[in-house]
Amino acid sequence: MKLEKLYDLYEAGKVSKRLYWELARERLVPLLEVQKIIKKNPYCKNVEIREDGIVLKTQDIELFFDMTQNICRAETILIGTEGEEIDFMSRFIPAGATIFDIGANVGRVSLGLAKAHEDSTIYAFEPVEETFHGLEKNLRLNGEEEHVKAYHMGFYSESGDLKFFVPAANEAASLRPITDTYYFKEGDQGQGECQDRLEEIVCPVDTLDDFVEKHDVKRLDFIKCDTEGAEKMVFSGGIHVFRDLRPVVYTEMLRKHAARFDYHPNEIIEMFTGWGYGCYTSENEKLIPFEKMDESTTETNFFFLHGEKHRELLEKYGD
């Protein structure tokens, strides 16, 4: 019996006080397990159960849990399955920076960078409407809705409206259907019933070059990009951005995602090489040159730095 049902029975006088205490205690014990995880996880401070939702508080940000998803950002941070890259990212961001968070999801990276760089200008882009509302909700929760400019849109090699495939776990939304059926399952919120879902929706997209021109962006220092395989198309729409503004880029590149778009991640490396960039992985807070991805590659996140513009950063963090 669920705790809420038990509560209703007690309120209706159908369960005695002592039986209610006993059964309620059994259902509240998992809170102690959550407390133990928080104690072990140095990044997490507490979990707050509120009237308007459940909130994870970290050292610097707050995120709503979304248990309608079978996995959510707050959850992965709490249980410690997601590494914390924001601190290292921050070292490549100068004072007064302009930052693009492409594929912002519910705002974990945007919020982390906003707290670390209070004098920055941050643009957060999320094309899926439901996820975008989660982004706005978390920005308001942290009081960062003015600092972080949220845009309901994505980027591609062309402008227009494109079809996105959105599984039940909408963080895996993509311009090509995913093949991992784990993300199809809806969050059961403890109800014990999981259904598969994959929807097709239309979302607005633009090119990097067009957006920068239309919004008169004169400076761009850092781009974080996570678009579930569309990274090559995102970057190919920013030729002038990478030739002229030359931001540091931190991006996900996975062979399995790229394959759904009929390209190999090495094509991204070649493209950036043509713009004067080098590709790097990171280890022990150092940049490691990375030339070519093959079947033995285990890294999934990569930095691109321009050889001339970012010479000082390369000297400081190069291996």
What is each stretch, according to the model?
Residues D52-G53, H117-A124, T207-D319:
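Conserved acidic-Pro-Pro-aromatic motif
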